[in-house]
Amino acid sequence: MNVNDCICVGAEPIAFVDYLAMERTDPRIAEEIGKGLSRGAEMANISIVGGETATLPDMIRGMDLAGACIGYAEKSKIVLGDKIMEGDVIIGLGSSGLHSNGYTLVRKILKEKGFSYSHKLGNESLGDILLTPTRIYVKEILELLKNVDVHGLAHITGGGIRNLMRLNKKVKFVISDPMEPQPIFYFIRKEGKVEWKEMFQTFNMGMGLAVIVPRDEKDDAISILEKNSEAKVKEVGYVDKGRGVDVKKFKLHYE
């Protein structure tokens, strides 16, 4: 998650520190967390340069895991979204699932409906689906930044599709052909009776990252992303006059 935020301003992640606080020491859980952090650092091509582990039974229930990422960018190449203009194209990169957002709502639904984490959704258990690691987009975005005039990058995390508005409040982002959400999102909507508008402003709904580029560089951008990413790459919309975000298929508008 941290490295994905870092690349959204055009910065290359270079280092990471982690912090793990536990109610009681559990070597097995700590080992699994360490493996995950190591794998994530490898995928992002960064070093874990430090961290802290604490046992705090008076303050923590379960555990608290946090981290911080440091990145580098030349000042003249920082991506702020101020170059976004009418006619630009929005390209989506597929997510791997929930991406660490909306879990409070998911746990509430599972508890109220009596679902166990072993409950099958398709060929996978809910537990395995919820533990699917967040997709890391560092490699493909750094390659894209070298070759295309990227106007904006949005990490679709908490806040969902509304995160596009953080890039530029003077235009309207139109999602005309959204990515297909994974089955877990349909499950959440059905079992929790959650409206589409709430779903799209809480979850990534299948799109983990949005890239905004000039229309005349769209084909090059898609080609570079497809060659360097494991994620599905798709043109999902465009930038228009107005303000906010439209998701046309679901007749949604956010301001």
Question: What is each of the regions a protein language model found here?
Answer:
Residues 9-13, 111, 115, 159:
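Short connector loops/turns at beta-strand edges and beta->alpha or beta->beta junctions
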Residues 10-12, 105, 149, 232:
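Short loop/turn motifs at secondary-structure junctions
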Residues 1-8:
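Active-site cofactor/substrate anionic-group-binding motifs, chiefly glycine-
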